[in-house]
Amino acid sequence: EIGFTGRGDTATADAYLTPLLIDYLRELKQHLPGSSLKMMQSSGGLIEAEKFRGHNSILSGPAAGVVACARIGERFGFPKVIGFDMGGTSTDVSRYDGQFERVYESQTAGVRIKAPMIHIHTIAAGGGSLCRFHAGRLLSGPESAGSDPGPICYGLVDKEGNLKARDLAVTDINLFLGRLLPENFPFDLNKVAVKARMQSTAEQCRMEGQDFTPEETAEGFLQITNLKMAQAIKEVSVAQGHDVRDYLLCCFGGAGGQHACAIARQLGIKKILIHPFAGVLSAYGMGVADTVWEGSCPIGQLHLNEENLDSLKTPFEDLEREGVTLIESEGFTRDWIETQRKLDLRYVGTETPITLLEPEDGDYEKAFVDQHHQLYGYIREGRPIEILQCRVEVTGKTETDPGQFIASVQSERIGQERRTSVYFSGDNHEARVLNRSDLSAGEKVTGPALILESIGTVWVEPGFEAGIGEDQNLFLDWISEDHSETNYTTESDPISLEVFNNLFMSIAEQMGTILRLTSVSTNIKERLDFSCAVFDRVGRLVANAPHIPVHLGAMGETVRAVIDQCPKMKPGDVYVS
């Protein structure tokens, strides 16, 4: 397979991980005599423990969450699902549209792994993300409080009895604004310390000339956090040519329910689903996953034509035979086994292939050109397409009913309905407090409301309506859009500075990603010798991506020179110097 360095990294990682996994699984099986033990893989499928390898385990947990989202969405008639998994230190986002989107090379902790993985985009934003005021901006993440010291409200103290945590975390912000209730936690929360730290942060803003109340400052932190997570979802949807408004937002993870409405509103998504097991949905996903084997065969670099496609018949059949034999050995009959053929294709001279499922009409060229145009916005007329690799995926379909575990979900009723004050959109709102188990099928709850669960809290914003559906799933519908206009001003503030910094930075980073994936130049696609940046109308630097910094000085001079020579630029114009 092409990619010597990636294969070397993968072999090294596997050599470290697999012996440890084998020892652990051997000990586990000794405690479970007579049991059949299957392991979750990063590709989204199960495999017998004896065949499990370390390099296939890297993202197995998050992949199980994506599988759960897909199965739940299909069960309720939603073939397109965005997975939004917000935990303590990070948020994982994914997209499903009838097929799992897989990548075959990724980088984790600086190590390149060549193995099938469900495409999951991870950002450093979670309930533990630190919220600080620095250099005139409100910052959320990427640093995290972790489990020790954790958020300020957890109240962990050192030997002298002093609070370990010094910085606010997103969880503290939600508590301060009333979106979390202390009585819904299994231990006491230190709300007094959170309030004091929030007031001191607002005072820092005032010393910089920004007259923010503690509540406005807190809401600014959430606005920045939500923007980062919404941008991550755009990376796996809009940036790849998909209209995110057509998708269901499947929200899970311990912190996801507090932010689901805000994320949906920013993206224009109309419906949210929160499963009863949302706090542990990855574990649930393992229970409903299929058994999957994936194999590949390097082809070399054959041009895409009828003759070369015909020559692939034998390697495809060999891979299918190997995969079906393995899946049958795990107890599946042929009626429950499905096979799929795929090809890795790319334009000659480029670096990154596109993996395509075999088209129904067999026209790989048209499928490739269409996909390339959707991803990158153009096609290369006259440049030949080459085949790098053929792949086969063999699936043993599970008979597990995704709803069969739900009957075991129990939670205590809170009795008489309560109300609490929640700060939202610049004002305090009286919100209903309900337990999920208090809601009967078909009953509707209009926001603002807090819906409590044993493993999470759901904040229903004004303009959203919540209701219980089949299998105790909670559906949130966006029923009232806010059509108020945003008032822009030339006066900067700590919130807007960070919001626009993230937006412009994202543009520059996307420019670099597309440039690398589509480039023919070795300097660009392998040495990464380039820089991308955004400039204002007079050529001043606005934002740059973390590329080679040496280019940035000359780049600004070049942009200003082009502006001087071409003063009548119009939208859509492109200049090459």
Where are these regions (language model features)?
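Short acidic loop-to-helix transition motifs that present clustered carboxylates
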Residues: E1-G3, Q41-L46, A63-G65, T89, ...
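C-terminal, non-catalytic interaction/recognition modules in large multi-subunit enzymes and RNPs
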Residues: F78, G88, G141, A145-S147, ...
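N-terminal glycine/serine-rich phosphate-binding loop of ATP-dependent small-molecule kinases
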Residues: A13, P19-L59, F76-K80, D97-I118, ...
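Glycine-rich phosphate-binding loop of actin/hexokinase-like ATP-binding domains
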Residues: R53-S60, A64-L175, C261-Q301
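Gly/Ser/Thr-rich active-site cleft segment
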Residues: E1-P62, G150-A202, G539
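Hydrophobic pocket-lining residues that define ligand/cofactor binding sites across diverse proteins
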Residues: L32, G73, S237
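A generic local structural motif
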Residues: G44-G45, V67-C69, Q107-T108, K234-V238, ...
